[in-house]
Amino acid sequence: MPTSGFVRSTGVFMMAPSAAAKTPITIRLCGPRGFCAGVDRAIQIVVLALKEFGAPVYVRHEIVHNRYVVEGLEAKGAIFVEELDEIPPEHRKQPVVFSAHGVPKSVPADADERNLFYLDATCPLVSKVHKQAMRHHRMGRHVVLIGHAGHPEVIGTMGQLPEGAVSLVETVEDADVYMPPDADNLGFVTQTTLSVDDTAGVIKRLHERFPNLTAPAADSICYATTNRQEAVKQAAPGCDLFLVVGAPNSSNSKRLVEVALRAGAKKAVLVQRASEIDWSTVGDISMVGLSAGASAPEVIVNEIIEAFRDRYDATVELADTVEENEHFLVNRELRHVELTGADMAFVNGE
């Protein structure tokens, strides 16, 4: 690793610090990290809708689980609501965007009833899970959904099928006691943002109890979740402190904290901004790991690096695993709209 000059990693430029009377530390920066293709697409849909239709554009639920992103979109004219009945009658000709996490079938049906124009920003990989669940159901199987109760993605997936057609299993302990309506006719799908290792344990236990359990045609856990967890696994050993940039309601970010601890980090913490770091508890450190959940923008990663540089003689070590090139198209209604350089910087989390 050079001791001076610029080092570039996924859009981040880092000036290696000159010698100073500060404690030297290394920041091990994971790659890939931050925005995935589904998050990028969802944010882009809201920005494009604002350019095409003007403010306000309503968004049902946080478009992605990150306050920095949500507040940035609010500043541009987006209004976030939890339910469609919060949209005032005088604004019902304005578009409403469904979040990247997906929605139950009842939500677009409700929008149609209210004569609302909606744009679905559901991540295509979440939509794939919906299709997998519906295929199990068409084949006459009861669907087991491995996921976290109350998460918007789980609510959306369960809402694709009639009530009672899906059972939620969260843990190996749940799998131990689960009693299906027909043990010989089961199919499973998973939430896309789970711990890869934890999910494998749940699936293994379900297969032990129900040998005829049918897997989906393709893995439900998304590429970005898998890649970020693998990068953290490789970077965490030897870290005195591991920071994950992400929101407390971000499933994939919380899983990264768990992965870091299991992989050998002495301490792992979830933070939304550099201002949340409790420096009084950091203690003696020489190696810091840093990653970001799939809905966390790169600008906050840079903010945290600079916060460490203010206090330490920090050198950044890149811990890249795989390169991500995935890209998802936005809705047809928006493909003709052009974004400025500033728009793209926001969409890319810069």
UniProtKB/Swiss-Prot annotation:
It catalyses: isopentenyl diphosphate + 2 oxidized [2Fe-2S]-[ferredoxin] + H2O = (2E)-4-hydroxy-3-methylbut-2-enyl diphosphate + 2 reduced [2Fe-2S]-[ferredoxin] + 2 H(+); dimethylallyl diphosphate + 2 oxidized [2Fe-2S]-[ferredoxin] + H2O = (2E)-4-hydroxy-3-methylbut-2-enyl diphosphate + 2 reduced [2Fe-2S]-[ferredoxin] + 2 H(+). Its EC number is 1.17.7.4. GO terms for molecular function: 4 iron, 4 sulfur cluster binding; 4-hydroxy-3-methylbut-2-enyl diphosphate reductase activity; metal ion binding. Isopentenyl diphosphate binds at residues 65, 101, 151, 250-252, 295. GO terms for biological process: dimethylallyl diphosphate biosynthetic process; isopentenyl diphosphate biosynthetic process, methylerythritol 4-phosphate pathway; terpenoid biosynthetic process. Transmembrane segments: none annotated. Dimethylallyl diphosphate binds at residues 65, 101, 151, 250-252, 295. The active site is at 153 (proton donor). Pathway: Isoprenoid biosynthesis; dimethylallyl diphosphate biosynthesis; dimethylallyl diphosphate from (2E)-4-hydroxy-3-methylbutenyl diphosphate: step 1/1; Isoprenoid biosynthesis; isopentenyl diphosphate biosynthesis via DXP pathway; isopentenyl diphosphate from 1-deoxy-D-xylulose 5-phosphate: step 6/6. Catalyzes the conversion of 1-hydroxy-2-methyl-2-(E)-butenyl 4-diphosphate (HMBPP) into a mixture of isopentenyl diphosphate (IPP) and dimethylallyl diphosphate (DMAPP). Acts in the terminal step of the DOXP/MEP pathway for isoprenoid precursor biosynthesis. This is 4-hydroxy-3-methylbut-2-enyl diphosphate reductase.
